[in-house]
Amino acid sequence: PAVLFMIPIIIGSLLQFFFYGYSLIWLGVSIGMISLFINVQKEAAYVDILSGLYNRQYFNNILLMHSKNGGAADALAGIMLDIDNLKSINDRFGHAEGDEAISIAGRILRAAVGHQGVLCRLGGDEFIILMHINSQKEIGELVDIIKAQVTQFNESGKKPYEIHFSMGYSIYQNEHGSIDDFIKKIDASMYEDKKRRIGAGILPDRRHHC
């Protein structure tokens, strides 16, 4: 964004030098500010306000571009996450605190993922991470980092509740299926993890889980 702001000013300054007497610098400033405003507005359209992460529209655009480009040399992996206890938080502490839990989940994931991938909130209590990988080992390593960040937050005791995620993943390569298949595989993998955690007594068995 800063580059978009500076380019018209630099051009205006150069033109001012050649066309003395014309107020071209301020014209450049005006154009720069308009360009910056338009760019900020475009970026805002792809950001989920509650979590501060990218939204579903941005996620769809990334997958579409990846598909059109024929895929990258390295595979595209997706890790889907679901906040296990959001319904309980809403029921016990109110929806305002439920919104805060979504915001906290976004911060936990941002701290874990860093620049390794793109973070999006799909809606409700579901998030997804997209990342280019060279081996499946990288997925496991990132999952471990996420778990460590979750533990760190929960042990801080900052809230009267804990944040926990069910997670699932899949790897997308163009020749192996469609985008829809990719998303369905991740979703199925995540709910298998949730089912396993319910079976192990880690999660309560809720028929309608949020």
Describe the function of each predicted region:
Residues 55-77, 87-114, 120-124, 128-129, ...:
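Conserved long alpha-helical elements within nucleotide-processing catalytic cores of c-di-GMP signaling
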Residues 140-147, 151-158, 164, 171-203, ...:
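Catalytic-core segments of nucleotide cyclases and related cyclic-nucleotide turnover enzymes
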Residues 129-134, 171-173:
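Short beta-strand-to-loop capping motifs
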Residues 1-50, 57-67, 118:
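Signal-transducing coiled-coil linker helices
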Residues 78, 127, 165-169:
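A structural signal for short, well-ordered beta-strand segments
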